[in-house]
Every structure is written in C-alpha cells, then in structure tokens.
Amino acid sequence: SPTGFMHLGNLYGALVDERLAHQSKGVFYLRIEDTDRKREVEGGVQMIIDAFKSFGLPFDEGATTDGETGIYGPYRQSQRAEIYQTFVKSLVQRGMAYPCFCTEEELSAAHEQQEKNKENFGYYGKYAVWRDRPMEDIEAELAKGTPYVVRFRSEGSIEHKIRHEDLVKGKMEVTENDQDVVILKSDGIPTYHFAHVVDDHLMGTTVVVRGEEWLATLPVHLQLFRAMGWKAPKYAHTAQLMKIDPETGGKRKLSKRKDPELALTFYAQEGYPVPAVLEYLMTLLNSNFE
C-alpha cells in the first residue's frame, strides 16, 4: 500500500515472499493496493520500489515507477475497477451480493444497539436490513440517486468452524464468517477483501504471506473464494515483530511513535549493513534457516 512509510514489518513479509518465490522457481511480483485513497501519499510507489531495491529484493514483475512489467496487469488496483465491478455484478446476478443503502447514521445506531445488547458488532442477521428488501425498494433508491455499497450475502454462522491448515501456524479451526461484508464501496472501488480475492486468482498467486493480524479476515476470504468457484491460495500468517519495552519490561509491538528502528531508513542512517538486517530477519523467521 503506497502510504508513504516503509517499515521493518514490510521488509519482513516481503523477504518471505521473495525467498519462497525464488526457491520454488516462482515469481515475486509487486501489486499496488491503492484502494484506500485517503491514505495514499504522492510518490508512495517509488518509496516501495526504492526501499526493497536497497535491501536486494528486486521484483520479477509488477508495478514500476513509470508503468509496469508483466502479463497479469494492471498491477495497480485503482486501475482494475472494471474488472472488480464485473465480478461483483456476477455475484449480484447469482443472488450472492446486494446493494445496501444504509447511511452512516443508521449503521452507527445499529452499532450502539449491538453494544447495548452485548451482541457482536457488524452487519448480519436482523441488522442486515437491506439483505432481503424487495426490488421495488431498491429501484426507488436507485431512481433517487441514493449512494450505496454492495455487500456479500454470507451464508456462514458463528456456530460453525472451518478447518484450515496455515503454512506457518499449522492445522487450525476458525469461526465461519456471518457478516455481510462490503465488497464494493460507493465510489465503485472494491474493499481489500474482494480485491485480494480477485487479484490473487487472476494473477495466479499460490502463496499469500501476511501478518497474523490478518488472520481474523481469513474466513471472509475463504468464503469469497468458494463463492467465486476459485481455488484459494495457501496462506502463511507470520508472527508480528515485537520488542521488550524498556519501561515496562513486557513485550509489545513496534511503534512508529516510539521506535525509530521500525523505519527502514533507520538502518542506513545508523550504518547497519544490508546483509546483517536480512540475516536478522531470516533468523527471526526461522532460527535454522541456513
């Protein structure tokens, strides 16, 4: 994501991607996930390319400074809107997705009610008020030009578990997703969930490496892959980078505000050789990697 701050966690994940790809004669590619326009910064793509290049992680294909290289483009999600919209339309036609015209105020009111009732937060069950609305209501809102998002119609239940084998965490059980998540925002751009599924299928992604903080989204992604009739890639959820807090003595996540060593620029400024940084990260990932 071109948000302007390249940190050690980015390099940590990319290092696994690169090694897995090249050790298996695969492809290490750069896809720019720029669907969150509010957080995007000018020159963000260049920062990503420069940062990884400085640590000896060149991309085989994908987005470049002045375009792209490879046969699976566009590699910028902001340029793939029509692709996503085509697949969303297919889900709507099959009754697996629907438009939702809820306002922010209505969603906030539902959230407050859920909090009051000590219920799970989100858009599901009786709170999914547009899930089964008659076509006349939908057509009336469309005629008025009311903004809407498109939601996936989940058939999951939190009473059920999914068995899954993660490449890092091994065999595990996760709770099914029962939320009717947004897959297309009101500006016609997909959410991360849907863009990830479509792109990983079309680009032939076989392994997705990401931090364990994304583990909670796994049921949504597996559900979307099944709905599309596609084989899901393998997932590897890596542990988050931690440090011992000098003040409390306890473990905590690295922080932009507190820890200058989180920024990739820190290591060149302090004179750390690139091989030493990579060796450190590889040892964290697998203590006997040699």
Please give the residue ranges for each predicted region.
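N-terminal Rossmann-like or analogous alpha/beta NTP/dinucleotide-binding catalytic cores
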Residues: 1-119, 216-230, 276
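Glycine- and acidic
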Residues: 1-3, 29-34, 202-208, 261-263
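Noncatalytic linker/hinge segments flanking ATPase motor cores
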Residues: 7, 69-78, 140-148, 234-238, ...
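Hydrophobic alpha-helical scaffolding
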Residues: 38, 74-77, 210-211, 266-271
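Active-site cores that bind ATP or allylic diphosphates and position pyrophosphate for catalysis
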Residues: 90, 98-237, 242-254, 263-264
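Short, surface-exposed loop/turn segments at secondary-structure boundaries that line and modulate
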Residues: 257
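A conserved active-site cap/scaffold subdomain adjacent to cofactor or substrate pockets
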Residues: 261-290
